[in-house]
Amino acid sequence: MNHPAELQVFSYLQKAMNGEATMTEEVANQVASDVKAALDKQFNSPPRDEFKLRMSNIGKPKCQLWFEKNDPEDKIPLPPHFLINMLLGDLVEAVFKGLLRASGAEFKDNDNVTLKLPDGQEIQGEYDMEMDGKIDDVKSASPWSYTNKFDSFESLQKGDGFGYIPQLVGYSKAAGKEVGGWWVVNKGNGEFKYVSASEVDSEQVIQDIQETVNYIEKDEPFKRCFEPVPETYFKKQSGNLVLNSACKFCSFKHKCWKGLKTLPSRVSKAKNPPEVDYVLIGDGLAT
């Protein structure tokens, strides 16, 4: 375990399962209040029609932000179940904070902050919590992300397409606190862990945020951040080019790559092959 509070929550859950611990009405009421606030936010907040750089999006690839600002009408519509996914994240945060409180772990709850950048711009956002003088985020993760992306800070840094690292550093800088890490809950089975971001180069991250803000504000010409990669099967190239993994969940991938085809894998031998985004098909197989 990477944080003392991990052991506190684990111990509390073990005692609760053995009938040796309960949850106070005060803690339960706070969880209920947080859940109510989450429902209100997801179902009663007005839509965000106007593009704005926020702490929650400032770490996304510049090419994606460019489209968000300059070509929003070509965005792939989000499916209705996306709202449930967002709500699940809020519910996980509410319940996990309740477990922290019930276990005796002390922390300060979420707060709104403003990041003042070196060139004078300001970015607003709301962090999840402060513990031991450090800013932490609570994340719900799929089983794959829990095991692979949130395995360590290094793993997250290699594929941080959602900008979790800049987001956390931005919150910490704005709050005048140290960078903490992420409390990650596996949506598949309830496992949880703490992933520390103590190794982060905060100065470099702030510099990257500044460059992103300048790029978007100056309306510079569009430029892709990623190139397609060769498709491989057992380390052998198929002759096809597929979308970079960083682009997989981008809502503008079809606008960015004309002729992009999302097809069942052309190399997989599985009964139900996974879908792959093909930029170029050159394997010679019949389409």
Whereabouts are the PLM-identified features?
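Metal-dependent nuclease catalytic cores that hydrolyze phosphodiester bonds in DNA/RNA
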Residues: M1-I135, S140-K158
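Alpha-helical protein-protein interaction elements
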Residues: N2-A5, V35, I58, G163, ...
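Generic signature of intrinsically disordered, low-complexity segments enriched in small/polar residues
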Residues: L13-K15, P46, R54, K69-N70, ...
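Metal-dependent nuclease catalytic regions and adjoining charged, substrate-binding loops involved
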Residues: M23, K158-D160, G170-T287
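Short, well-structured alpha-helical interface segments that form or flank functional binding sites
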Residues: L91, V95, Q124, G163-G170, ...
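Generic beta-strand structural signal
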Residues: G125-Y127, G133-K134, P166-V169, E178-G181
